[in-house]
């Protein structure tokens, strides 16, 4: 199991990084800003998330009989990932603050991503606690956590990027009303 999760866990943190970049571009653009709030903090946060993903793999293995010190380490290390993640969410919201916001579809996808990612992150903090994780192991709570963060989160970021850059790549624009309806149906 250690071999599997040592590879498999960092992968999910790396998979979400392009979504972070797309959301940063979209939020800054539709807030009328040149760059996101706290640009260097965002860069360091992405690097920290990428690196911390390599030292928390065993939080997938709390139920296999690890000793208490090992569980305490992996609980703490997993919770530390919430700090750079919180920096990113705060910076996206701070970028929107005081901006001339254009409420177009890509921004809706980005805001949907921020909401879903935040809910998924809160469920992740609960699951990082090894005592609670043992109770919640193999339940829909865990399924909800990774679907909020990666399945829906990554899809919303990708859709935001697609809707934002599709006119640039193709020369065609998407119908604004139908694309907003598409977002609404996906969000519900």
UniProtKB/Swiss-Prot annotation:
Q: Which organism is it from?
A: Amia calva
What this protein is reported to do is described as:
Component of the cytochrome c oxidase, the last enzyme in the mitochondrial electron transport chain which drives oxidative phosphorylation. The respiratory chain contains 3 multisubunit complexes succinate dehydrogenase (complex II, CII), ubiquinol-cytochrome c oxidoreductase (cytochrome b-c1 complex, complex III, CIII) and cytochrome c oxidase (complex IV, CIV), that cooperate to transfer electrons derived from NADH and succinate to molecular oxygen, creating an electrochemical gradient over the inner membrane that drives transmembrane transport and the ATP synthase.
Supply the name of the protein: Cytochrome c oxidase subunit 1
- Tell me which family the UniProt entry assigns to this protein: Belongs to the heme-copper respiratory oxidase family.
Question: What is the UniProt remark on how the cofactor binds and its stoichiometry?
Answer: Binds 2 heme A groups non-covalently per subunit.
The residues the record assigns to binding Mg(2+) are 137-138
List the molecular function annotations (GO) for this entry. cytochrome-c oxidase activity; heme binding; metal ion binding
Q: Where does Fe(II)-heme a bind?
A: 147
Query: Which residue intervals are topologically Mitochondrial intermembrane?
Result: 56-67, 127-139
Q: Any idea which UniProt keywords this protein has?
A: Copper, Electron transport, Heme, Iron, Magnesium, Membrane, Metal-binding, Mitochondrion, Mitochondrion inner membrane, Respiratory chain, Sodium, Translocase, Transmembrane, Transmembrane helix, Transport
Q: Where exactly are the transmembrane stretches of this chain?
A: 1-30, 39-55, 68-96, 105-126, 140-169, 176-188
Q: Name one GO cellular component term.
A: respiratory chain complex IV
Q: Where does Cu cation bind?
A: 9, 59-60
Cross-link named 1'-histidyl-3'-tyrosine (His-Tyr), where? 9-13
- Outline which residue ranges sit on the Mitochondrial matrix face: 31-38, 97-104, 170-175
Q: In which pathway does it act?
A: Energy metabolism; oxidative phosphorylation
The entry's localization annotation reads: Mitochondrion inner membrane
Which GO BP terms apply?
A: electron transport coupled proton transport; mitochondrial electron transport, cytochrome c to oxygen
């Amino acid at each position: 199991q250690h071999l599997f999760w040592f590879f498999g866990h960092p992968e999910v943190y790396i998979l979400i990084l392009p979504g972070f970049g797309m959301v940063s571009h979209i939020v800054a653009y539709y807030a009328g800003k040149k760059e996101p709030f706290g640009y260097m903090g965002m860069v360091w946060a992405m690097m920290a998330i990428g690196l911390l993903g390599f030292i928390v793999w065993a939080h997938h293995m709390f139920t296999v009989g690890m000793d208490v010190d090992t569980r305490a380490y992996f609980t703490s290390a997993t919770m530390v990932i919430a700090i750079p993640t919180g920096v990113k969410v705060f910076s996206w919201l701070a970028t929107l603050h005081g901006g001339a916001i254009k409420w177009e579809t890509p921004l809706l996808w980005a805001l949907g991503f921020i909401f879903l990612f935040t809910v998924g992150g809160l469920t992740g903090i609960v699951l990082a606690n090894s005592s609670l994780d043992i109770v919640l192991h193999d339940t829909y709570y865990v399924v909800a956590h990774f679907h909020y963060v990666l399945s829906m989160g990554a899809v919303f970021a990708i859709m935001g990027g697609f809707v934002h850059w599709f006119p640039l790549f193709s020369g065609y624009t998407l119908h604004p009303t139908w694309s907003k309806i598409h977002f609404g149906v996906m969000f519900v």
